[in-house]
Every structure is written in C-alpha cells, then in structure tokens.
C-alpha cells in the first residue's frame, strides 16, 4: 500500500534525525477502529528506552514531525501506551485511482526481484480420474503460481507422475482382470483392486481392439493393460486440468529418476552429509538425527527403492536444476511426511526456507444438503470433470479457494449454481459486471471519461463511502504481498468478497450518473473503473473470469 510506504519513509527519516535506528519489530497496520486513523505504528514504544523518554511522549514527537514534513498526512496523534495514529488526506487517497489507471493489469505486482520457485501440485496417481479433492489442490496450486508471479517470483510448475510404484501395478492388474471377465474367463478378485466404470471402459476398448488379448500370458497382458490404462487416464487428467484452466509446464516421470541417475546422485549427496548407513543389507537415512521420529529405509535388502527414496531424488533433482525455493502441494493425509522430507532437505545442505508444503484438506461435496461419498478404488466418487460440467470452472475454482487450504471445505453444489448474490463467485463477478454496465450507460449518455484521471477530475470524491472504497482498492498490493508471504491464496478471495461488498453498498447508496452534476459523475466513473480493474486483477490470480455482463 502506498500509504504504508509513505509513512515508513517519512518516519524512518525522522527516527534517523533523532539518532535512532529503525526498529526491526516495527508494525504498521490499520488500527482496529477506523475512527482512529488510516494507519497505526508502534515505533515509539520500541524506541522509548533507547531514547530515554516516555513512549507516549516520543509518539507525540513523531506525530508532530510527521505533520510538519509530510503534506499527505492530515492528522497524526499519539494513542494508548505509545502508538502513533495517522490519517491521510482525501487527496492522497484519490491518487489511488491514478495509480491503478497507470498500472492497469500490472497493478498489485511487485517490482522486487524474486526467487526461482518450483511449484509441484496435483501429482495424483494416474490410477483414475481426478476427484474433487484433486480439484481443490489444482485450484490452490495454479492460483498460488499466479500469486507468486505477481509477487515477482519466477515460477515453474510441475506434475510428478507416480508411474513406478505398487499402485500402478495394481492398476494394470485391475484392467487385466476386467479383460478376462469380459472374455468370460474365471477371475479371482484381490481385495484392493480398482473397481470404477472407467476400468471396465478401458478393458472393453482393449478387448475390442485385440480379441486375442485374454490368451496372452498374464505378465505380458498386465503390462499392456498398465500402459494403456496409464496413458488413457493421464490424458484424461490433462484434459480435465486444461478445462480447469490449470497448466503444468512439465510432467515429470518418476521412472526417469533411476534412468537418468538422479537417485544415485541424491544418495551421493546424502552420503556426503554423513547421514546414511547400511544395515541388514539395506540402505538407510538417519532422519532421526534431523527431527524425524525414526530412521528411514531408502533401498530395501532386495534392491528395490522406497517411495521416500524417489521423493528425495526428485527434490534433489529440483535443486540441481537451479531452483532455490521448492513448494509442494500435498493432501493433508501427508502431514506426517513433512518432517522426513525436511530432514532430507537439511541433509542436502539447503536452508529451511528453501522448502515449503501447502496442505490441502478434504472437500465435503454436498448435493441437496447431503454428502456425496467418494472412493477412488470403489469407483463411487464425483470426478472433477463432473463438478466442472455441473457448476462451471469459475464457480468451482472460487469455491475451492474460498477457505484456507488446510481447513476442510463444504462445497455446496446447489449454491455454486445459483445466479444470486448468495453465491460467492456470482457476488464478486456481479460487482465487475455492474461496473461495466454503469460505464456502458455512461458512454451511451454522452459522458466521456479520459483514459487517465487528474487531481481536478477526482476532486469531487469526498464522501466517506468514496474514501472507504479508495482505501480498500489501495490495500490490494499489500494483500497480495501478505498472501504470497503466507502462501495463502484464500486471502485473495476474501479480499475480493469484501471489495465487492463495498461496491454493492456504494452502488445502492450513491447514484453514479448525475444529469445535473457532470464533474461528480466523471469522478465516480473513474473510481468505479479503477475498482473494476482491481477486481479483474484479483480474479485473474484466482483463475476466475471477470464477465462484463451477467
């Protein structure tokens, strides 16, 4: 927010003139009660002992100096035990409109150089279609990539294909047994096979293309079924994600880790750290020394790799490719996996802030108030494709992003389909459409709004509601920064909901097109146009469209 930077710059100069240093624990934020000002700062309380004075007296001195040297400050006063509360002038807040007009689509973006980020998300086993839980992870991961790019980071996105484990062998077996069943052969079903209709569809397609398939030896038949099933399912996943406006820049195969020597390279890196050892013909990683609850096997006595070994190799490979911040989006059921992966990152010699995990909690899908049961293996789940078809990509993404990702989410399908202000995504999109409608009507009535507003055009913006809307629009930059810092995309949806609420309230209280007051009309049109730009920019972070009419 320009207000925070303005206050920080002015106050830092005052503190330096006093022979003091800017306190690292300084907090500049809006006071709880907006009647107490636009911003409150605690510097005086942090510096009082060093300045050998009373915190409140120091706050009073800071307030007086701010009024003297900062023309944008309309009011500054000491409050409480030593806060300094600051109110900016209306002219200062009106400048928000010109800031937004100048930046356009780039409004809210950071100009600071960022980090090289590798963001891995979804990465569902290609054993079946994506379900709504995967959809939430997809929405969070894709929007997080958009958010981090806004914050100045260079973000590469990947989908890790688990194509080398037991689940894939079980997938091939499940399709093979369906092929035999469709051919009238006797079949003994294992307890944990995949039962969905999609398995039957793949088996039927294979049998139609090759009627002699059931006569093949089981190992060869299972391999063919595995290859066909994985290819079909993975293509379906890619199609679903494309429909959901989700793009992964690379699809990384687990199998390639062994083929390219990435596993050996990772083991060598861990060996240099002194945390690996051999015991009982197995290769171990001493994660207990690094905060895990026990040591972990990487290579079993039969020579096969554990899942953990592959994951370590994959993360080591990411660092080797030059990325300095790895972010994984995992299901909440993987929470216990974080300490051992952090141990591996530490053993590689990387800093703690080089690895973060965003957890995705369960989605409780509701239809007519009743929960929809989901089980991938039983084939009784609601797919992401089904949800997109029923409620649309916009509603699905916004709903998935409406709560903190590590909190369970109730997804009400009926609510998501409503074309009313009770529907959260409709509420925000309608704010944008409403602004566009006003601008169209204004043009039809002959009001000509210049591309860039000047101080004279904006001067009629002088009501309390004008200032409230301006302050909220100005807060967009800080909100994006805080959301990126915390990896919390839900902050964006919450902000947009609040901004839309202020816009709807403003529209209800104030007539925008005034036949007898052209100057005020143009000022309000400029205000609404800038708010519309902020709504568009925010919806873009969420991967949600901003319709011009609804």
UniProtKB/Swiss-Prot annotation:
Protein name (record): Arginine--tRNA ligase
Gene Ontology annotations for the cellular component aspect, listed alphabetically: cytoplasm
UniProt feature coiled coil, ranges: none
Catalytic reaction equation(s): tRNA(Arg) + L-arginine + ATP = L-arginyl-tRNA(Arg) + AMP + diphosphate
Compartment(s) of residence: Cytoplasm
Record bears the keyword Aminoacyl-tRNA synthetase: yes
Entry-linked InterPro entries: aa-tRNA-synth_I_CS (IPR001412), Arg-tRNA-ligase (IPR001278), Arg-tRNA-synth_N (IPR005148), Arg-tRNA-synth_N_sf (IPR036695), ArgRS_core (IPR035684), DALR_anticod-bd (IPR008909), Rossmann-like_a/b/a_fold (IPR014729), tRNAsynth_Ia_anticodon-bd (IPR009080)
EC number: 6.1.1.19
Sequence motif 'HIGH' region, location on chain: 124-134
Complex formation: Monomer.
A biological process from GO: arginyl-tRNA aminoacylation
Nucleotide-binding among keywords: yes
Organism of derivation: Desulfovibrio desulfuricans (strain ATCC 27774 / DSM 6949 / MB)
Keywords: Aminoacyl-tRNA synthetase, ATP-binding, Cytoplasm, Ligase, Nucleotide-binding, Protein biosynthesis
Family as reported in the entry's similarity comment: Belongs to the class-I aminoacyl-tRNA synthetase family.
Entry GO MF terms: arginine-tRNA ligase activity; ATP binding
Enzyme category, top tier: ligase
């Amino acid at each position: 927010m320009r207000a925070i930077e303005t206050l920080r710059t002015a106050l830092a100069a005052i503190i330096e003139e006093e022979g003091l240093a800017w306190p690292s624990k300084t907090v500049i934020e809006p006071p709880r009660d907006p009647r107490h000002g636009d911003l409150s700062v605690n510097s005086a309380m942090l510096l009082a002992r060093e300045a050998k004075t009373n915190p409140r007296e120091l706050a009073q001195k800071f307030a007086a100096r701010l009024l003297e040297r900062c023309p944008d400050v309309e009011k500054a006063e000491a409050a409480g035990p030593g806060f300094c509360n600051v109110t900016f002038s209306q002219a200062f807040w009106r400048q928000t409109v010109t800031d937004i007009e100048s930046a356009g689509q780039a409004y809210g973006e950071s100009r600071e150089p960022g980090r090289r980020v590798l963001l891995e998300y979804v990465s569902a086993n290609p054993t079946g279609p994506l379900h709504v839980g995967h959809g939430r992870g997809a929405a969070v991961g894709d929007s997080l990539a958009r958010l981090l790019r806004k914050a100045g980071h260079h973000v590469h996105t990947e989908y890790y294909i688990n194509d080398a484990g037991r689940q894939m062998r079980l997938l091939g077996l499940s399709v093979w047994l369906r092929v035999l069943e469709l051919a009238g052969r006797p079949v003994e079903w294992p307890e944990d096979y995949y039962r969905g209709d999609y398995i039957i569809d793949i088996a039927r397609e294979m049998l139609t293309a090759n009627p002699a398939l059931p006569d093949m030896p089981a190992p060869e038949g299972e391999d063919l079924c595995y290859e066909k099933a994985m290819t079909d399912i993975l293509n379906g996943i890619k199609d679903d994600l494309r429909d959901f406006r989700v793009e992964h820049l690379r699809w990384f195969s687990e199998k390639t880790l062994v083929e390219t020597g990435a596993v050996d390279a990772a083991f060598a890196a861990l060996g240099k750290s002194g945390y690996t050892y051999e015991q009982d013909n197995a290769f171990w990683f001493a994660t207990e020394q690094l905060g895990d609850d026990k040591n972990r096997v990487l290579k079993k006595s039969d020579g096969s790799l554990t899942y953990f070994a592959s994951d370590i190799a994959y993360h080591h490979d990411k660092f080797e490719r030059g990325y300095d911040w790895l972010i994984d989006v995992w299901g909440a059921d993987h929470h216990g996996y974080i300490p051992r992966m952090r141990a591996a990152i530490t053993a590689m010699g990387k800093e703690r802030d080089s690895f973060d995990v965003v957890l995705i909690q369960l989605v409780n899908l509701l239809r007519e108030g009743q929960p929809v049961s989901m089980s991938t293996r039983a084939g009784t789940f609601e797919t992401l494709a089904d949800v997109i078809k029923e409620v649309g990509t916009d509603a699905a993404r916004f709903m998935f992003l409406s709560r903190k990702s590590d909190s369970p989410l109730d997804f009400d399908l009926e609510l998501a389909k409503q074309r009313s202000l009770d529907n959260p995504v409709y509420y925000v999109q309608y704010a944008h459409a409403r602004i566009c409608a006003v601008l169209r009507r204004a043009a039809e009535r002959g009001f000509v709004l210049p591309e860039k507003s000047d101080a004279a055009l904006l001067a009629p913006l002088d009501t309390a509601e004008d200032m409230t809307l301006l302050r909220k629009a100005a807060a967009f930059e800080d909100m994006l920064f805080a959301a990126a810092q915390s990896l919390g995309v839900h902050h964006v949806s919450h902000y947009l909901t609040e901004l839309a609420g202020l816009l709807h309230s403003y529209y209800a209280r104030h007539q925008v097109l005034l036949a007898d007051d052209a100057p005020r009309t143009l000022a309000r049109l400029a205000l609404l146009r800038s708010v519309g730009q902020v709504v568009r920019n925010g919806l873009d972070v969420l991967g949600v469209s901003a319709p011009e009419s609804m």
